[in-house]
Design a protein with these regions (language model features):
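General structural feature for long, well-ordered alpha-helical segments within catalytic domains
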Residues: 11, 48, 67, 111, ...
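Histidine/acidic-rich helix-loop-helix segments that form or flank divalent-metal centers
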Residues: 36-46, 50-54, 107-165
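Short, mixed-charge aromatic SLiMs
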Residues: 89-93, 120-126, 173-179
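Charged substrate- and nucleic-acid-binding regions of tRNA-handling and nucleotidyl-transfer enzymes
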Residues: 99-104, 158-179
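Feature representing long, continuous alpha-helical segments
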Residues: 66-69, 92, 96, 100, ...
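Glycine- and charge-enriched loop/helix tracts that form the active or gating conduit
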Residues: 1-67, 71-89, 93-106
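A ubiquitous short alpha-helical element
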Residues: 82-86, 138, 179
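A glycine-rich phosphate-binding loop feature that marks nucleotide/adenosyl-phosphate handling sites
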Residues: 17-19, 30-34, 70, 114-122, ...
Length: 179
């Protein structure tokens, strides 16, 4: 956790390269080894995860969320006829994995609950209109909703530039509707 909330969460790559994650978090190794042939991604799942962790503030819940947000992708990877990779259902599986791993590592229930909810909803489509923002606020609560906006921003920034401006503008509109 100290590494995750440090100024250098990217050092997770060193833990992977030296074989440490293979022992303490083997699920991370599978992420590092899973490529994403998709216009929205430049990096393997693991490198995308590292970049996403670097995009959020040094907060335990946010960094853990980014660590786990795509952990289900290796198990959900499919490739279509055009050679494009898809990961349908990965958010739900990632949330389940996050809960199991955080429990295994003896995290407190509050952290487990927040991280699991954020991971499960990180790809949730929220239309920037009052009706849909209210619905998301009711479903998630204000604290999780605001954290989710940070998670979504970090996720976009760690992807390719494909539609990045459009995605970021939508997040700005979501925040404006909320405020």
């Amino acid at each position: 956790v100290k590494l995750l909330v440090s100024d250098h969460p990217g050092h997770m790559k060193i833990l992977y390269e030296t074989g440490i994650t293979k022992v303490i978090l083997p699920e991370f190794d599978r992420m590092m080894e899973t490529e994403q042939n998709n216009p929205h991604h430049l990096y393997s799942v693991g490198m995308h995860t590292i970049r996403a962790m670097e995009e959020v503030p040094a907060d335990k819940v946010l960094r853990l969320t980014m660590l786990f947000h795509d952990m289900g992708k290796p198990a959900k990877k499919t490739t279509d006829a055009e050679g494009i990779d898809h990961f349908h259902g990965h958010a739900e599986l990632s949330a389940k994995m996050a809960k199991e791993i955080l429990q295994r590592l003896k995290f407190d229930n509050d952290t487990i609950g927040k991280v699991t909810k954020l991971v499960k909803n990180h790809d949730r489509k929220i239309i920037p209109h009052a009706k849909y923002v209210r619905r998301a606020l009711c479903d998630l609560g204000e604290e999780i909703f605001l954290l989710l906006l940070e998670v979504k921003h970090a996720d976009v920034m760690a992807q390719s530039t494909c539609r990045r401006e459009e995605k970021l503008e939508e997040l700005v509109r979501l925040r404006e509707v909320y405020e």
